[in-house]
C-alpha cells in the first residue's frame, strides 16, 4: 500500500485588511496551490485527497488555504477542522496577519471598502469585533506577521523567507515575435533586433526560419550580432538579481524582428543558451514562427 504523504499545508488567516491577498499571491509565486475561503468542513477531505498517490491532485505538494471572517458561519467550523487534523497527526501551519487598528482604519478609508463586520459604516467597531473573534485562532498560529509598517514588497520578502526554498529562483521566459503581429502583451523587456542583417532579403534563406542552421549561420556571422547578443546577455545577468531583489518571480524578455521568422528566432535561441546554467530557470518560446512552418506565409 502506498505511503501517505500529505502536502505542506499553510492556512492563511488574520484581520481583514492586513494583507492576506498579497501574502497568498506570494505563496502562489512560491508554487503553492491556493484555495480562497474553502469551507472548513472540506479541509480534511481535501488534505486526504492530496495525500494519497494515484488520486486527483497528485503532484501538488504545497497547499495554502485562505480562511477569514468573510466565511461567516463556515469560519466557525475551522477550529473543529484543525482539531480533526491534529487527531490524525496531519501537520499544518497557520500564518496569521494583523496590523494596528489605526492602520487598518486608514487602509479601509483609502480603498473605500466596507469592513465585513462593521455596522453603520463604523470601521473601528468591525475591526475590534473581528480581533475578538480571531483571538483564539491567533493563539494557535505558527507564524504571526504584523504588517503595520510593511510595504507590499517587505511583506512578500517575509512570506518568501518563511515558506520559500532556501534559494529563490527567477523564471526567465524568452519570446521571439514579429512586430507586424504586435508586441507580446506580457513582455517586461522588449528588444528590437531589426537593425541586424535580414535573411529575408537572401532568396535562398527566405523560406527557412531561425531554427535552421543556414539562417543561424547567416545571422551570427555578423560581428554586430555577436557583440550585441553577448552584451544583451550581460545586461540581463546584471538586471536579474535586482529584479529578484524587488520580489519579481517571472521576467518576460521579448525579442522582435519584422515577422518573427528569422532574426528574433535565432537570437532568442542563442540568448537562452547563454543564460542556461545560471541561478534562474530559462524557457524559450517562439510566438510567430509557426506561421511560416506550414502555411508558407511570406512577408
From Swiss-Prot:
Keywords: ATP-binding, GTP-binding, Nucleotide-binding
Protein name from the UniProt record: Nucleotide-binding protein Moth_0258
InterPro entries, per the entry: P-loop_NTPase (IPR027417), RapZ-like (IPR005337), RapZ-like_N (IPR053930), RapZ_C (IPR053931)
NCBIfam families, per database record: PRK05416.1
Nucleotide-binding found in the keyword field: yes
Residues binding ATP, per UniProt: 14-21
Function: Displays ATPase and GTPase activities.
Residues reported in the UniProt entry to bind GTP: 68-71
Record-linked PANTHER family: RNASE ADAPTER PROTEIN RAPZ
Entry similarity comment: Belongs to the RapZ-like family.
Transmembrane segments: none
Keyword set includes Acetylation: no
SUPFAM superfamilies: P-loop containing nucleoside triphosphate hydrolases (SSF52540)
Single GO molecular function: GTP binding
Amino acid at each position: 500500500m502506498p505511503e501517505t504523504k500529505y502536502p505542506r499545508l499553510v492556512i492563511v488567516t488574520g484581520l481583514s485588511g492586513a494583507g492576506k491577498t498579497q501574502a497568498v499571491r506570494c505563496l502562489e509565486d512560491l508554487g503553492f496551490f491556493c484555495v480562497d475561503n474553502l469551507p472548513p468542513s472540506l479541509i480534511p477531505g481535501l488534505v486526504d485527497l492530496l495525500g494519497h498517490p494515484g488520486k486527483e491532485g497528485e503532484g501538488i505538494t504545497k497547499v495554502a488555504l485562505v480562511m477569514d471572517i468573510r466565511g461567516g458561519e463556515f469560519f466557525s467550523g475551522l477550529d473543529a477542522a484543525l482539531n480533526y487534523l491534529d487527531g490524525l497527526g496531519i501537520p499544518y501551519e497557520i500564518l496569521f496577519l494583523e496590523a494596528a487598528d489605526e492602520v487598518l482604519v486608514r487602509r479601509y478609508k483609502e480603498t473605500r471598502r466596507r469592513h465585513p463586520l462593521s455596522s453603520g459604516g463604523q470601521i473601528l467597531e468591525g475591526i475590534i469585533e473581528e480581533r475578538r473573534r480571531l483571538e483564539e485562532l491567533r493563539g494557535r498560529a505558527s507564524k504571526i506577521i504584523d504588517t503595520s509598517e510593511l510595504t507590499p514588497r517587505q511583506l512578500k520578502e517575509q512570506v518568501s523567507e518563511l515558506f520559500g526554498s532556501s534559494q529563490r529562483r527567477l523564471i526567465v521566459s524568452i519570446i521571439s515575435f514579429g512586430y507586424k503581429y504586435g508586441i507580446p502583451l506580457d513582455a517586461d523587456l522588449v528588444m528590437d533586433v531589426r537593425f541586424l542583417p535580414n535573411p529575408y532579403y537572401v532568396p535562398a534563406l527566405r523560406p527557412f526560419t531561425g531554427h535552421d542552421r543556414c539562417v543561424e549561420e547567416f545571422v551570427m556571422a555578423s560581428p554586430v550580432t555577436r557583440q550585441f547578443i553577448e552584451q544583451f546577455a550581460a545586461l540581463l545577468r546584471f538586471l536579474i538579481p535586482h529584479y529578484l531583489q524587488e520580489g519579481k518571480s517571472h521576467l518576460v524578455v521579448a525579442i522582435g524582428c519584422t515577422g518573427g521568422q528569422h532574426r528574433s528566432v535565432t537570437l532568442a535561441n542563442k540568448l537562452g543558451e547563454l543564460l542556461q546554467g545560471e541561478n534562474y530557470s530559462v524557457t524559450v518560446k517562439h510566438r510567430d514562427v509557426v506561421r511560416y512552418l506550414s502555411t508558407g506565409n511570406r512577408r
